[in-house]
């Protein structure tokens, strides 16, 4: 889910932190990608014309493998080096959100069954997408595919977004890529969104620069995290009735969640907002400030040449993909990863010193002219 309303709030109050560009603008970059979010996207988006997920002859879902294979090739063809990060065990505090998702999924399954005989294809697809979840088996299949492709992946001990941010902070990669806005709470220098969307959607890539967000909002890290918790995150419920506008106003007025809670608790007659009983906002704050991650210095990322015959065995013989397409994709991978991705030009040039203003130039010219006249007079 991420943080409710954060994307729009940043666009409104910190527009200088936002950039939009095309995939080609990221050439030469290494990027840590939230794999679990990607697989979820692929299971929803990669479908047959009738709306069903891709399957092989045995009826096994293969949408996630198709998406991972072809979107990764697209990144490599644009001289981008991806590293995928998989979720580990979720924090205990996230249990409530996961339970809500399970209930929503079960309700969607019931709705889908109710309209099975009389509903339209569009209705069926809509409810079908709501039932999607990434299984452990699908995660393992994606990891096996990445190994054969020669693309590195990291198993995060906990949240994938936090590990992506750690790799970016530690200089292993340029940016963290995820659709979850709570990624920005873990301090990646840059957050990229829409990176693995299909070309057909024609969505530009969003880049959010963390330091510029804090600077524009005039907040330190802790205050920004408090804002995100107040907006609504996966770790705890928020204060009922508090939307983005009110949350921003309260944080600006009081400076922290502790003071907001104190004010609302001590002044029930001045506000309609009620703090949830035993609200674990402080525990949520600690999870954002000190997430469970592997230190970037301990992670060794290595991109290798793809195992073409291994890909044929796995993707064609076991999963039912077209051999011609897999071989063609493997050749593109081979070409893209051969010898490493080309470095960016901005790494070879230093900034040009700011030119002197015209007044300085004029003074120099006047001085030079005066010296010239004096020399002629002496002759």
From Swiss-Prot:
Region of interest called Interaction with PCNA, as start-end residue ranges on this chain: 341-349
Region (Disordered): 344-379
Swiss-Prot/TrEMBL GO biological process terms: base-excision repair; DNA replication, removal of RNA primer
Keywords noted in UniProt: DNA damage, DNA repair, DNA replication, Endonuclease, Exonuclease, Hydrolase, Magnesium, Metal-binding, Mitochondrion, Nuclease, Nucleus, Phosphoprotein
Binding site for Mg(2+) 1: 34, 87, 159, 161
Free-text comment on the cofactor: Binds 2 magnesium ions per subunit. They probably participate in the reaction catalyzed by the enzyme. May bind an additional third magnesium ion after substrate binding.
Modification after translation (UniProt): Phosphorylated. Phosphorylation upon DNA damage induces relocalization to the nuclear plasma.
Record: residues binding DNA: 47, 71, 159, 232, 234
Protein name from the UniProt record: Flap endonuclease 1
Native species: Debaryomyces hansenii (strain ATCC 36239 / CBS 767 / BCRC 21394 / JCM 1990 / NBRC 0083 / IGC 2968)
């Amino acid at each position: 889910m991420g943080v409710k309303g954060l994307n729009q709030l940043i666009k409104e109050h910190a527009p200088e932190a936002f950039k939009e560009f095309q995939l080609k603008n990221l050439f030469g970059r290494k990027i840590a990608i939230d794999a679990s979010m990607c697989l979820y996207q692929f299971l929803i988006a990669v479908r047959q014309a009738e709306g069903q997920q891709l399957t092989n002859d045995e009826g096994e879902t293969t949408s996630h493998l198709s998406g991972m294979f072809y979107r990764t090739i697209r990144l490599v063809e644009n001289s981008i080096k991806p590293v995928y990060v998989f979720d580990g065990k979720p924090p205990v505090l996230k249990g409530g959100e996961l339970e809500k998702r399970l209930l929503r999924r079960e309700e969607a399954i019931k709705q889908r069954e109710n309209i099975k005989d009389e509903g339209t294809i569009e209705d069926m697809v809509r409810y079908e997408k709501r039932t999607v979840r990434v299984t452990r088996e699908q995660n393992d299949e994606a990891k096996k595919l990445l190994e054969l492709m020669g693309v590195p992946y990291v198993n995060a001990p906990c949240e994938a977004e936090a590990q992506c941010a750690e790799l970016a902070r530690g200089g292993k990669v340029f940016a963290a890529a995820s659709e979850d806005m709570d990624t920005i709470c873990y301090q990646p220098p840059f957050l990229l969104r829409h990176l693995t969307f299909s070309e057909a959607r024609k969505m530009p890539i969003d880049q959010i620069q963390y330091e510029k967000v804090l600077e524009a909002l005039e907040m330190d890290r802790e205050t920004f995290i408090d804002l995100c918790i107040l907006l609504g995150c996966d770790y705890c419920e928020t204060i009922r009735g508090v939307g983005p506008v009110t949350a921003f106003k309260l944080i600006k007025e009081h400076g922290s969640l502790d003071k907001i809670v104190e004010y609302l608790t001590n002044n029930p007659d001045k506000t309609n907002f009620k703090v949830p009983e035993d609200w674990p906002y402080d525990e949520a704050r600690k999870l954002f400030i000190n997430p469970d991650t592997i230190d970037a210095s301990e992670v060794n990322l290595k991109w290798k040449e793809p195992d073409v015959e291994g890909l044929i065995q796995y993707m064609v013989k076991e999963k039912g993909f077209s051999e011609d397409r897999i071989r063609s994709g493997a050749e593109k991978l081979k070409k893209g990863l051969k010898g490493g991705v080309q470095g960016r030009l901005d790494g070879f040039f230093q900034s040009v010193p700011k030119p002197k203003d015209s007044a300085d130039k004029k003074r120099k010219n006047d001085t030079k002219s005066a010296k010239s006249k004096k020399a002629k007079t002496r002759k």
